[in-house]
Design a protein with these regions (language model features):
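GH16 jelly-roll
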Residues: 1-159
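Accessible peptide chain termini
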Residues: 1, 185-186
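Solvent-exposed, low-complexity, repeat-rich "mucin-like" stalks and linkers
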Residues: 159-185
Length: 186
């Protein structure tokens, strides 16, 4: 694959933007340096990876009773052009209006990919320990929907997005180097 992707359509992390609807850094049964199984974070990432301000915490929500591991919970995002509202169990826990932030508008007023993963350890979370066997990450369902305004904004984005023309199937034969972009224009 030719690596010359239009910068209008692709970029590396965090320039491309990342919306974390739910992040949890667990601790067994107690609050450990601000980390526990009672607390979740909602975070945006945008800008250069060398920019120390590429992460913006939108909110932190702590369960009033119990821990998140006790039952299923609903984590959500109501995402409209220039605004996001994050919710936990149908309660809005944080929001951001980024209508005056050009970098956020460039990152977040466009489609994003959805990814659900269980990550352990790292710079933020610290050492995950040695007892990771048998861990579970259970998801009951995922729902995606749009209201009329969100549909209109999506349609406007795609109408103005760069179009790729001339795409075609290519047969790869060992020893040959085909021009993968032959006849392709934007």
């Amino acid at each position: 694959l030719d690596g010359r992707i239009s910068s209008e359509q692709g970029a590396s992390w965090p320039v491309c933007g990342e919306i974390d609807i739910m992040e949890m850094i667990g601790a067994e049964n107690e609050d450990l340096n601000g980390k526990s199984n009672k607390k979740v974070y909602q975070t945006l990432h945008a800008g250069s990876a060398t920019d120390v301000d590429h992460s913006k915490s939108i909110s932190t929500y702590t369960l009033p009773e119990g821990i998140f591991n006790d039952d299923y919970h609903i984590f959500g995002l109501n995402w409209s052009k220039n605004k996001m509202e994050f919710y936990v169990d149908n309660k809005i826990v944080g929001s951001i209006d980024y209508s005056n932030n050009e970098e956020y508008k460039r990152c977040f007023n466009r489609p994003q990919y959805i990814q659900m993963n269980l990550a352990t350890g790292g710079n933020w979370a610290g050492d995950a320990g040695d007892n990771l066997a048998g861990q579970k990450y259970e998801i009951d369902y995922v729902y995606y929907g749009q209201n009329a305004q969100q549909k209109a904004d999506s349609k406007e984005y795609y109408e103005n997005a760069i179009k790729i023309n001339g795409e075609h199937d290519v047969t790869m034969t060992e020893g040959e180097t085909p021009n993968l972009l032959e006849g392709v224009t934007s």
